[in-house]
């Protein structure tokens, strides 16, 4: 009896050892574009695994400005002067939607590409957003509300409105193509803050749900996705969906899991521990980011160290943040050094280990 019991224990031990010795199967998170470039696939998978780390798990980010208007490397320089470190992500906006121009596509400028290419080659990741001019007008008017009937005309490529949209998209795609040709993956964030009432592509009234409007927005988002992906064959984009934290209907506009790689919140706040929407967005089962952040009252008194502490305590699935520039910047507020030097924060130069991304933690 004793011998049988001993043999049984030995068998159980050997079985347990075999299970423990079996390597953990790697879980790969791929971009929604099945034809994505290998580097883009690698970056997407690496980003998605960041929450598994115990440190170096939240990419720092900064907005560099609007191309050919305010964009420069000055924001990165200010942050480096304040902290000794540089943001891992650097953002540019291709669209100056407020400009009154002869042709609406003239509001699109991609001259920040040279700096973004250099940033990538020196260990950073570019992000591109679009404050698109309003195709219901000849140019400008990015904050002028439109009716749903006007929205439908914008979606129709045979109308003057639709042709204006297409002209802008063509020029944007040309700029993105230049980045792809250089092997540069891009965090691409079109049509942001759609649940707010300030941009033409979003709602028209404060927290008033409009199901037709929501449907039109989804059609517009998908139109842009299919144009960039299928028509233009751009395979280096990581698609980012980013509603506003201070408005309702954060997930109502979600175009679907097949069109979004990363979900996030644009959040301007005074209390970093009271940002709305984290649970709603993470329930979509996509990597989560604070896609645009800054203090609600921009007077230099905001403490960014509280923000990274809040991420650690309340929003631990966060993979990156992108702070706005000018008076919202960490460089002109408090706690910039604590934010960038926190053990959770990952900065430019810490993404790559030689020619390979730093190790993934399963």
Predicted regions and their residues:
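Sec-dependent N-terminal signal peptides of Gram-positive bacterial secreted proteins and lipoproteins
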Residues: 5-22
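N-terminal module-boundary/linker segments of secreted carbohydrate-active enzymes
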Residues: 22-107, 308-309, 350-362
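Alpha-helical scaffolding within the catalytic cores
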Residues: 43, 70-79, 110-114, 172-174, ...
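Substrate-binding cleft of secreted/luminal carbohydrate-active enzymes
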Residues: 54, 58-64, 291-362
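Loop/turn elements at helix/coil->beta-strand transitions in domains of secreted/extracellular proteins
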Residues: 54-58, 85-88, 122-127, 181-187, ...
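Aromatic-lined carbohydrate-recognition surfaces of secreted/lumenal glycan-active proteins
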Residues: 62-63, 189-191, 221-249, 288-298, ...
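Substrate-binding cleft of extracellular glycoside hydrolase catalytic domains
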Residues: 99-230, 234
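Glycoside hydrolase catalytic-domain groove-lining segments
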Residues: 248-300, 338-339, 343-356
